[in-house]
Amino acid sequence: SRKREGMTILPPFNTSEAGINTGRADALYGSISYISNSNKEYVLFTDCNVVCSMNYDKFIKAHIAKDADITIAYANGIPSKIENGTELIMDADGRVTGTGLVDCYSSSVNYSLKSMIIRRTLLERLLHEAHSAKIDDFETIVSKNIKHLRIYGYEQTGFVRVLDSLQSYYDVSLELLKLENRKQIFTAD
């Protein structure tokens, strides 16, 4: 049924052990029992501050076609002044070979949109690894495993903006008043 097979949104779950969540890995670990009991093969997670029109069917098909362990959505360009932004360093095939920190002085780079697809069982393993090492940021645990995992990038093209402040929210809202930008976000299909 739709209720059992559709998308599930996991809110951060605070436990008495963990207290307040300090990062994505910490928040996901709070829901580890739900994740472990799921029958889904893949998990997609994404931040809520990216404005774009992403085709998740194409995203998952690219993940499967590459036989990837993790696929990370990225955009190429000059990133906004995002804090803790991650640059993806990739080979010619799109495999992530390293990461770097995006700063406000960055030129055109492949920057992570913090959306990724991962096999559920691998997610569980990485969350346990992060929890035992007291790593609360999921991107840190992924970066530590770049040499051991098949991590690929998936380029998001078109209108892509990252909201990182009230000012950027206002600026992007103004950009969406332009018909050509709205057409890239709100498609007929």
Q: Language-model segments: which ranges?
A:
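Short, conserved catalytic or adaptor-binding loops enriched in Gly and charged residues
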Residues: 2-3, 7-8, 89-90, 141-146
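Conserved N-terminal catalytic core of the sugar/cofactor nucleotidyltransferase
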Residues: 1-51, 58
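Left-handed beta-helix
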Residues: 121, 130-189
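Glycine-/small-residue-rich active-site loops that bind phosphorylated ligands and cofactors
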Residues: 16, 51-52, 80, 160-161
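Conserved core of the sugar-phosphate nucleotidyltransferase
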Residues: 53-124, 129
